[in-house]
């Protein structure tokens, strides 16, 4: 059985350390657990893809090259190409509705206003996939627009704290892989 792990983020160097790209950063660390596995461009699937074969089946990791708001286009293309069941999809994304550092794993969840999640749900015609949501919090100052906040760089303090988020996310990812997660 093939599983799909989707990182939500924006392509391009200027976005690497932005809050909206925490999904890309997390998936990069997850893929590092598999020696010799690297992302490769797959233009026809609108993604960078890394594939892992294990005793539990195949796992396809993607970083869509469509920008956050159009993530569903890439997810639908990869899902169709590899014939992946919707309930075998895990989407890793930032979450402004959770305090910085909170990590949640849920199935069949709403989008919480996240346009990338909304795009995926619309493209799949279902929300019966898993979400690993990484809390990035909200702006501390009232005069900061939410879009500027999510596209803003992590502070030095957040860059240090994000390492703990990745450790917790990795543990929840392992539970999801083994089927021992709770929704």
UniProtKB/Swiss-Prot annotation:
One of its GO terms (biological process) is protein quality control for misfolded or incompletely synthesized proteins. It comes from the Bacteria. The active site is at residue 20. TRNA binds at residues 15, 67, 69. The record marks 94 as: Stabilizes the basic form of H active site to accept a proton. It is an enzyme of class 3 (hydrolase). Its EC number is 3.1.1.29. GO terms for molecular function: peptidyl-tRNA hydrolase activity; tRNA binding. It is found in: Cytoplasm. GO terms for cellular component: cytoplasm. Keywords: Cytoplasm, Hydrolase, RNA-binding, tRNA-binding. The record marks 10 as: Discriminates between blocked and unblocked aminoacyl-tRNA. It catalyses: an N-acyl-L-alpha-aminoacyl-tRNA + H2O = an N-acyl-L-amino acid + a tRNA + H(+). Monomer. Hydrolyzes ribosome-free peptidyl-tRNAs (with 1 or more amino acids incorporated), which drop off the ribosome during protein synthesis, or as a result of ribosome stalling. Catalyzes the release of premature peptidyl moieties from peptidyl-tRNA molecules trapped in stalled 50S ribosomal subunits, and thus maintains levels of free tRNAs and 50S ribosomes. Belongs to the PTH family. This is Peptidyl-tRNA hydrolase.
């Amino acid at each position: 059985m093939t599983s799909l792990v989707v990182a939500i983020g924006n392509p391009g160097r200027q976005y690497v350390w932005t809050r909206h790209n925490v999904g890309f950063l997390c998936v990069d660390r997850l893929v590092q657990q598999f020696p010799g596995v690297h992302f490769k461009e797959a233009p026809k699937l609108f993604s960078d893809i890394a594939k892992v074969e294990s005793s539990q089946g195949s796992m396809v990791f993607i970083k869509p090259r469509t920008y956050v708001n159009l993530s569903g286009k890439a997810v639908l293309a990869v899902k169709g190409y590899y014939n992946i069941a919707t309930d075998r999809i895990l989407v890793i994304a930032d979450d402004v509705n959770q305090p910085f550092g909170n990590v949640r794993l849920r199935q069949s969840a709403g989008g919480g206003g996240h346009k990338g999640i909304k795009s995926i749900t619309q493209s799949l015609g279902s929300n019966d996939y898993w979400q690993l949501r990484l809390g990035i919090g909200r702006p501390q100052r009232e005069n900061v627009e939410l879009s500027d906040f999510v596209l803003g760089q992590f502070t030095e303090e957040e860059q240090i704290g994000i390492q703990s988020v990745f450790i917790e996310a990795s543990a929840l990812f392992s539970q999801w892989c083994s089927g021992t997660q709770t929704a």
